[in-house]
């Protein structure tokens, strides 16, 4: 399945309440965002998903955002549409997020990953919605607003996710590695578990083995001190999800044998004991724990 967008073609972005949910084709993409027509302007660059497809906005009317395809590709399902965070009028989390979050907590979810967190206030709102249930909240850091308020977000979150996909759209790509390391380091210093996510093994959606660059990416995340590595499309729509998990397990495990956590912790100097109980052996060695399915249910914006 999917829709192919060709370079130079005209395409309309239409809110769900006008187009109807899930009615996308090569000329119209249905978007789950009610304020779409007011938050985009002529001249804007719009990217779909994690940035592989880009559109330029020609005009906006009362029914649709009219775009031209700059970089084409295949649109699968209902792709996320990136809108600059400083222009978002939609409150986060949305009312729908709060309802779904409560339902997931009541269903027994261990974690909720809260998307597009812009401040610690967003986490407090979600925490109030799921109270008194003790579900843990994962703050997805994927906007520059979140980077600006990182200290407060880390203090409020039960765990933090380095969501490199949308973060790499919000900022220049060359900044992503530095921001990733900064987020991981600050989480380690605060004793808050941190997850590194997005395109860890993207090639294995179709390939039986990862690229050398992906192998290095996983190992370097381990060496930086990440507590978890998360798979997304590789296991959601990939050809062989089990092989992906086994391969990541092997790479991450090998990296751990090379990491001197005692020396690494001494260099870091300010590592606090984590909020989650660990054994004395684990606390002294500062090991990395790899969670391939970080939570049973993720609260995602699709």
Say what each PLM segment does.
Residues 1-101:
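Beta-strand/loop-dominated core regions that host nucleotide or nucleotide-derived cofactor-binding catalytic loops
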Residues 13-15, 47-49, 67, 114, ...:
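General beta-strand structural signal in soluble alpha/beta enzymes
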Residues 76-87, 105-109, 161-166, 256-270:
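Gly-rich Lys/Arg/Thr-decorated short loops/hinges at beta-loop-alpha junctions or inter-strand turns
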Residues 213, 217-268:
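Active-site or pore-adjacent capping/gating segments
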Residues 89-198, 204-215, 219-222, 236:
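Conserved alpha/beta-domain cores
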Residues 281-302:
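Single conserved hydrophobic/aromatic residue that forms the stacking wall/gate
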Residues 89, 138, 189, 248-280:
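Long, charged amphipathic helices and adjacent flexible linkers at domain junctions
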Residues 76-77, 133-149, 246-255, 259:
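Conserved anion-binding
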């Amino acid at each position: 399945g999917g829709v192919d967008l060709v370079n130079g073609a005209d395409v309309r972005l239409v809110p769900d309440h006008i187009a109807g949910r899930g009615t996308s084709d090569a000329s119209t993409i249905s978007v789950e965002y009610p304020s779409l027509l007011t938050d985009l302007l002529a001249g804007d660059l719009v990217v779909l998903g994690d940035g592989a497809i880009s559109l330029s906005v020609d005009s906006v009317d009362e029914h649709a955002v009219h775009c031209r395809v700059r970089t084409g590709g295949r649109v699968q399902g209902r792709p996320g549409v990136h809108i600059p965070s400083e222009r978002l009028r939609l409150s986060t989390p949305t009312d729908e997020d709060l309802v779904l979050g409560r339902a997931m907590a009541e269903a027994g979810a261990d974690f909720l990953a809260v998307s597009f967190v812009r401040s610690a206030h967003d986490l407090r709102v979600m925490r109030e919605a799921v109270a008194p249930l003790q579900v843990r909240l994962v703050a997805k850091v994927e906007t520059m607003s979140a980077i600006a308020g990182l200290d407060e977000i880390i203090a409020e979150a039960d765990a933090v996710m380095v969501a490199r996909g949308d973060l790499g759209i919000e900022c220049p790509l060359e900044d992503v590695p530095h921001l990733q390391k900064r987020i991981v380091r600050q989480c380690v210093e605060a004793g808050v578990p941190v997850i590194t996510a997005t395109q860890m093994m993207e090639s294995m959606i179709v390939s039986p083995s990862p690229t050398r660059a992906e192998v290095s990416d996983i190992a370097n995340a381990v060496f930086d001190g990440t507590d978890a590595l998360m798979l997304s499309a590789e296991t959601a729509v990939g050809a062989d999800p089990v092989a992906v998990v086994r391969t990541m397990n092997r790479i991450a495990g090998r990296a751990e044998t090379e990491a001197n956590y005692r020396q690494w912790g001494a260099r870091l100097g300010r590592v606090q004991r984590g909020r989650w109980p660990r054994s004395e052996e684990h606390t002294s060695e500062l090991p990395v724990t790899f969670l391939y399915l970080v939570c049973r249910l993720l609260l995602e914006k699709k």
